[in-house]
UniProtKB/Swiss-Prot annotation:
Magnesium is required for nucleotidyltransferase activity. One of its GO terms (biological process) is RNA repair. Keywords: ATP-binding, Hydrolase, Magnesium, Metal-binding, Multifunctional enzyme, Nickel, Nucleotide-binding, Nucleotidyltransferase, RNA repair, RNA-binding, Transferase, tRNA processing. This is Multifunctional CCA protein. Its EC number is 2.7.7.72, 3.1.3.-, 3.1.4.-.
Length: 413
C-alpha cells in the first residue's frame, strides 16, 4: 500500500504556482484496509476516502472503461492490482498525468514534464474523446494558463473538434457546462475559454447566442475591430482586467447579444440592441441554469450599457429612474458593476484599450448624491404612504440636478 500525490498539485508545483488542493492515489490497497487505517469513505461510484487528519482526498488506483453515453458513462475498476501508470493513463492531459512519491520523485509515464516545458496541453490517450466534458476542461485550462504561454496541441484540438462534430456535447448537463464556464470566468484570461470553444466549433453548440455575433459588423467609426464577436471577447478581456467579479465578467460577455438579432438590411447600425438582447440573456441563462443574481445583472447590463455612455447629457430624472430600474437602493453594488461593464465595453475596442472612462466615475458620484438624500427627513417632514416615495424621488432628482450643474455643465446657446 503506497500513496502518491497526483494531478494538479504536482503540475502547479512544477510550474512554481501556489498549490491549492492536494489529491492522492493509493496503490495496492483495498477499501477495507483504508477503513481500518481510519480513513472515511466518501465516494459512491468509486472508492475515495478522506485522510483522518488532513481531510485530503485519497482515491484507490482505478481504471475506467466506457460503458455508456456522456461523461458519466464509465465503469470503474479499483483493485490492489491496478498500477499507478494505469491510473494516470485515464487522465485527460499529460500535464495532469503526473505523480510524486513520498521522497519527492516525479513519476511521469506520459511526458507531462516535457509538455510543461513546451507549454503544451496535450491529451494522454485516444480515450480522451470518450468524455465530452474534457472539451470544456481543456478550454478552461487554456484560459487558466494562457498568461504562462500555454497552447493546445494541434492533435488535441483536432480531437476536440471531432468530438463536437460527433455530437458528444449533447450529453453534457447544463449544470456542468455552467460550472466549467463559471470557473473559466475566474481566470486571468476568460476570453481564451470562449475563443478555444469557437476554434473547435463548440461555441455554436453551447453558446449559440455568442457565436451568432461573429460576422455581424458594427460602425467602423465606433468599432475599428468591426466584428461584434471580436468586440465581445475584447470586452471580456478588459472586464477581467477591471474586476475579479464573475458577475461583471459574465454580464460583459452578454452585453451585445441583441446585435445578433439585427436584420442584415440595417447593418452596421444596431438601434435598440440593448433591450432586444435582454430576451437572449434570459434564454442563455435559463438553458445553462445560471444563478439568478448573475442573470439579473447581465439583463440590466444588456439593457442599459449604452445609456451609461451618454451620462454627461442625461437628465437628472433619467439618472434617478435608472437607479430605480436597477434596484440600486437595495442592491447598491450594481452601480459599480454596471459602471465597470460599460467601461469594459468602451475600452474593449481596437485602439481604445487605454481610454479614460469618466462616465463610470460620474455614475458613482451621481449615485452617492442620490442615496445621500435622507428617508428619515422625508418622514419627519410629515409625508405619509405613497407620498414618501414621491417626495424622496423629487429630492433625489433635485440633488442630482444640483450636482450635475457643477460636474457636467452643458454648453450655452
Amino acid at each position: 500500500m503506497k500513496s502518491y500525490l497526483v494531478g494538479g498539485a504536482v503540475r502547479d508545483a512544477l510550474l512554481g504556482l501556489p498549490v491549492k488542493d492536494r489529491d492522492w492515489v493509493v496503490v495496492g490497497a483495498t477499501p477495507q484496509q483504508m477503513l481500518d487505517a481510519g480513513y472515511q469513505q466518501v465516494g459512491r461510484d468509486f472508492p475515495v476516502f478522506l485522510h483522518p487528519q488532513s481531510r485530503e482526498e485519497y482515491a484507490l488506483a482505478r481504471t475506467e472503461r466506457k460503458s455508456g453515453a456522456g461523461y458519466t458513462g464509465f465503469t470503474c475498476y479499483a483493485a490492489p492490482d491496478v498500477t499507478l501508470e494505469a491510473d494516470l493513463l485515464r487522465r485527460d492531459l499529460t500535464v495532469n498525468a503526473l505523480a510524486q512519491d513520498a521522497d519527492g520523485t516525479i513519476i511521469d509515464p506520459y511526458g507531462g514534464q516535457n509538455d510543461l516545458r513546451l507549454r503544451l496541453l496535450r491529451h494522454v490517450s485516444p480515450a480522451f474523446s470518450e468524455d465530452p466534458l474534457r472539451v470544456l476542461r481543456v478550454a478552461r485550462f487554456a484560459a487558466r494558463y494562457a498568461h504562462l504561454g500555454f497552447r493546445i496541441a494541434e492533435e488535441t484540438q483536432a480531437l476536440m473538434h471531432a468530438m463536437v462534430e460527433a455530437g458528444e456535447l449533447a450529453h453534457l448537463t447544463p449544470e456542468r457546462v455552467w460550472k466549467e464556464t463559471e470557473s473559466a470566468l475566474t481566470t486571468r484570461n476568460p476570453q481564451v475559454f470562449f475563443q478555444t470553444l469557437r476554434d473547435c466549433q463548440a461555441l455554436k453548440v453551447l453558446f449559440p447566442e455568442i457565436d451568432a455575433l461573429y460576422g455581424v459588423p458594427a460602425p467602423a467609426k465606433w468599432h475599428p475591430e468591426i466584428d461584434t464577436g471580436l468586440h465581445t471577447l475584447m470586452t471580456v478581456t478588459m472586464a477581467a482586467m477591471l474586476s475579479p467579479d464573475v458577475d461583471v465578467r459574465f454580464a460583459t460577455l452578454c452585453h451585445d447579444l441583441g446585435k445578433g438579432l439585427t436584420p442584415k438590411a440595417l447593418w452596421p447600425r444596431h438601434h435598440g440592441h440593448g433591450p432586444a438582447g435582454v430576451k437572449l440573456v434570459e434564454q442563455l441563462c435559463a438553458r445553462l441554469r445560471v444563478p439568478n443574481d448573475i442573470r439579473d445583472l447581465a439583463k440590466l447590463v444588456a439593457e442599459y450599457h449604452d445609456l451609461i455612455h451618454t451620462l454627461p447629457i442625461l437628465q437628472p430624472k433619467t439618472l434617478v429612474k435608472l437607479f430605480d430600474s436597477i434596484d440600486a437602493w437595495r442592491k447598491p453594488q450594481r452601480v459599480q458593476q454596471i459602471a465597470l461593464t460599460s467601461e469594459a465595453d468602451v475600452r474593449g475596442r481596437t485602439g481604445f484599450e487605454a481610454s479614460d472612462y469618466p462616465q463610470g466615475r460620474l455614475l458613482l458620484e451621481a449615485w452617492e448624491v442620490a442615496q445621500s438624500v435622507s428617508t428619515k427627513e422625508v418622514v419627519a417632514a410629515g409625508f405619509k404612504g405613497a407620498q414618501i416615495r414621491e417626495e424622496l424621488t423629487r429630492r433625489r432628482i433635485a440633488a442630482v440636478a444640483q450636482w450635475k450643474e457643477q460636474r457636467c455643465p452643458q454648453p450655452q446657446g
